[in-house]
Amino acid sequence: MSKLSSRQQAIIEFIRKEVRDKGYPPSVREIGEAVGLASSSTVHGHLARLEKKGLIRRDPTKPRAIELLSDEDRFQDNFEDSVVRVPVIGKVTAGQPITAIEDVEEYFPLPDNIVTSDKVYMLRVSGNSMIDAGILDGDYVIVRQQHVANNGDIVVAMTEEDEATVKRFFKEKNHFRLQPENATMEPIILEHVTILGKVIGVYRLIH
């Protein structure tokens, strides 16, 4: 955070004093009188810069709605601005296919540099067929919704029996191969497959 000017520091201290003594913040006019600013637009300019620095929060619809933010408040605001809440949808297997459940169970915060569109969701993995790719039983895969995939992509795929599974995708002559990342398991060979999304990340709780 950049250093405050003496005027901005005076404004912060006056707001803090008024809230402490009176229980509510001062008006723009009162702030101007206290720090020697005759122009309300100049006061508004200082308040806007303080808000941009994360030191205050204002409600433009109310004349006295100026709130001083603590370090915790500023951290929370920055956190809220830098995350996107994505839906956690049902469960998907990394072993044998299971029916895909599309009901949203909850929403989970992810960094906005991962969630670059509104087509991202999470699924909980059940099974061990992707362990060699670092996807373990109980993990959550982060999935970008798309209906095409390149050979070698890890995807969530819907089989011919309308069941969803996480596998590595390969399009081969006359069929599709959904390849597990576990040497003890056989691939799933299908004539038709529907891609539900590409796995772009994994979230794991360490117990």
UniProtKB/Swiss-Prot annotation:
Keywords: Autocatalytic cleavage, DNA damage, DNA repair, DNA replication, DNA-binding, Hydrolase, Repressor, SOS response, Transcription, Transcription regulation
EC number: 3.4.21.88
Pfam families to which the protein is assigned, alphabetical: LexA_DNA_bind (PF01726), Peptidase_S24 (PF00717)
GO terms (BP aspect): DNA repair; DNA replication; negative regulation of DNA-templated transcription; proteolysis; SOS response
DNA damage is among the record's keywords: yes
Signal peptide region: none
Molecular function via GO: DNA binding; serine-type endopeptidase activity
UniProt name for this protein: LexA repressor
Native source species: Brevibacillus brevis (strain 47 / JCM 6285 / NBRC 100599)
Biological classification of the source: Bacteria, Bacillati, Bacillota, Bacilli, Bacillales
Annotated gene: lexA
